[in-house]
């Protein structure tokens, strides 16, 4: 896995509701944990762009609801700072559901994804229609 060059402020914490940006049948996801987060006692785990998270499906098809899955954050409302000084933020918080190998489970990604996620996850970038 490649390091992200931008200064990413974690804009999502445990318990946040985010939209699902793929066509797996899930519409809304709830963050239950953040992979690799090493925080302090009583501090809520936080996630940002490109982080792998564990989510629970709260809205979607009956087959997808109440499943616990892994996902990657592809959009966040909190601005991030790129090395050239520009700041990028999106209209919503969104994630893409992935399998054990880190490849997207869906065949289509709705909406744009960030360039930082595209550099880290090549298979998600090849599925995406727009990279910002």
Curated annotation (Swiss-Prot):
Q: Which key words tag this protein in UniProt?
A: Ribonucleoprotein, Ribosomal protein, RNA-binding, rRNA-binding
Any one GO CC term of this protein is:
cytosolic large ribosomal subunit
So where does this one cross the membrane?
none
Question: Some GO term, biological process aspect, for this entry: which one?
Answer: translation
Q: Which Pfam families match?
A: Ribosomal_L14
Does the keyword Lipid metabolism belong to this entry?
no
Gene Ontology molecular function, alphabetical: large ribosomal subunit rRNA binding; structural constituent of ribosome
Q: Cross-referenced Gene3D superfamilies, in alphabetical order?
A: Ribosomal protein L14
Which residues pair up as cystines?
none
Q: Which domain of life is it from?
A: Archaea
Family statement: Belongs to the universal ribosomal protein uL14 family.
Explain the purpose of this protein.
Binds to 23S rRNA. Forms part of two intersubunit bridges in the 70S ribosome.
Under NCBIfam families, the record lists: PRK08571.1, uL14_arch
Subunit record text: Part of the 50S ribosomal subunit. Forms a cluster with proteins L3 and L24e, part of which may contact the 16S rRNA in 2 intersubunit bridges.
Q: What is this protein called?
A: Large ribosomal subunit protein uL14
Q: What species is given as this protein's source?
A: Halobacterium salinarum (strain ATCC 700922 / JCM 11081 / NRC-1) (Halobacterium halobium)
What gene name is given for the protein in this entry? Answer: rpl14
